[in-house]
């Protein structure tokens, strides 16, 4: 549990098992019991940048649903935003953690933190490959371990 000076925010790893239950962000985000939650999805670089360069364009590619947990991408374009993407690759996953990749991840996490604080969300869900939350859950892109570890570290240190 990470805390800010104003409130406590729970950062919760979530494992996808099957559609229509916990772990399925597309289902969870529609349930009343998750109305105080913000969801982090794995984004591709092109759509991540499209949204961040023009967040006011609900018809743009940065607001279109994607595969896997990016099905909730349109929720980052709603008011208030209920989701935010962290880029995990371009046409395939980032293989290594270079400065460009770090910068994109840092930009995403900063925006997510700002949105969570501004909208008083109590919980943040991110996709994990296990309940211990040590590694990012990925399905479509094959993302390098150091990249996945960096993303999880940044998510977990948002309120430090």
For every predicted segment, state its role:
Residues 2-160:
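Macrodomain-like recognition of ADP-ribose-binding/processing modules
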